[in-house]
Amino acid sequence: MRKIRLMNSMLMTLPGTPIIYYGDEIGMGDNIELPDRNGVRTPMQWHGGENAGFSEAAKARLYAPVIDEGDYAFLEVNVAAQEQDPDSLLNWMRNLIKTREQHPALGQGRFELLRPENTAILPFLNQSEEDIVLALHNLSPEVERTELDLAEWEGRQLIDLFTKQVFGTVTPHMNIVLQPYEYLWLGIQ
């Protein structure tokens, strides 16, 4: 799940329009038993009822069968179940999208890739007239450390955009430690 969240964090902070394919917001899997690309075209898993809530049609009339076994079975992975869980991928995605919408620098701002010595960490800045967002992504399964040149913003506060808590004060050569597959969205204020 950490890799899925990391990938979606990158999707929402890199330049361009983020595209979420149906089912990605709940971690819906593929039916690898189906030929060609049909494995990714299974019915949306809305709830744990008949046909996963996708259709009232007879099961045989569906374009593709619902995923009914394994890790991605509709009884386990569906919208209704995740709506009840505040820590679910669906609710996390909703918060991620809402946070992105609240910060014009994400998606509309000027993008600047930072180049730390540690290439396991992908750091970049998104800047607009309204705000500056420092996005950090640890692409490694290990704890990673790096130093970033943030002298331009020395003395300003770093605010975690999800928790709204102060992360720290910017120093010219900021030392950052990220847990495996961790990501941070930090506003520079």
Q: Where would I find each of the regions flagged by the language model?
A:
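A structural detector for beta-sheet-dominated domains
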Residues: 47, 114, 149-151, 179, ...
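A conserved amphipathic helix/loop scaffold
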Residues: 137, 167-170
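A short acidic, often aromatic-flanked loop/helix-cap motif at beta-alpha or helix-coil junctions
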Residues: 51-52, 166-168
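Residues at the C-termini of beta-strands that transition into short coil/loop
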Residues: 48, 162-165
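C-terminal beta-strand-rich structural cap/linker in extracellular carbohydrate-active enzymes
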Residues: 169-189
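A residue-level signal for conserved active-site and pocket-lining positions in enzyme catalytic cores
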Residues: 96, 158, 181
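Loop/helix patches that line or flank the sugar-binding groove of alpha-linked glycan CAZymes
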Residues: 1-133, 139-147
